[in-house]
Amino acid sequence: RGSVRPWSRCFWSSWVGDLFTDLIGQPLAVNLLTAALQQQRLAPAYLFAGPEGVGRRLAALRLLEGVLAGGVLSSRQRRRLLERNHPDLLWLEPTYQHQGRLFTSSEAEEAGLSRRTPPQLRLEQIRNVSRFLARQPVEAERGMVVIEAAEAMPEAAANALLKTLEEPGHGLLILLSAAPERLLSTIRSRCQLIRFLRLGDADVQQVLQRCGEQKDDPLELLAMAAGSPGALLEHRRQREALPVDLVDRLETLPQEPMQALALARDLCESLDGQQQLWLIDWWQQKLWRCGAGHDPMHRLEALRRHLLGFVQPRLAWEVALLDLSVS
């Protein structure tokens, strides 16, 4: 299963050459992955390293298609990959833990769960990787595992993954990471590194056009996206989710203490922890473009550290906004 017969090698080479055509702005990654498939010399583990939203997830899907196809991939197989319900595919994301259950970011948002801290890849998730790869594949030649945000592993989970990488068997692991420097060096050394770069403006617009998502974006959102079409779409979503009255009040710094305290109260009542962290980034860009100077930027950066350090959010916002109202 999955091997290429000599008589079909020419067709296979041509098909693989077209496999990554929708991966825009990543020629180096495309060349490396295409060559690996054409020569049938896949590494046991890959590290797709680069910013969020520049095509790492799409590249992983296309590579999996190439692994499954053997020259031909049915629409049913492609749909199962996209829906992540192929029996030989395990796709992991960082999760939140609530009442003994694990929730991905999208599931936590749908369930209305409080998200004060970033999600993590849990030890039990990583242990499942080893069990998954140890079993006999159902349809494919090998078990396939994709781990998103691999840098979100605490030490115990990272050590468990390292043991799997030391004896990967016939499986294929793809780690996606926007911060590969946070991974154990021993994990990085056991993966073939594929770098993904930020896109130029023309490539960003080409991606958005293909997705039917072109529009005039505020300069602060474009700056936050920094060459990442996926990040731009996520920043749009976050911006559109903000209550309109809060956006209006954040156009300028608070002028009076009572105004600052009321804003802190309303922010904490309206936004969860992850939304508050996003808001700091957005407000910094907004104020910088309005010529607010360095002091508000430094104060908002300190606020971010306090929120990440488990300071009570409303208290952290009150102190920060009071400082900003008199600065």
Whereabouts are the PLM-identified features?
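Conserved Walker B
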Residues: 149-153, 168, 180
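Clamp-loader machinery-focused feature within the broader ASCE/P-loop NTPase space
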Residues: 17-156
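Charged, glycine-rich active-site and insertion segments that engage polyanionic ligands
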Residues: 17-82, 170-172, 177-327
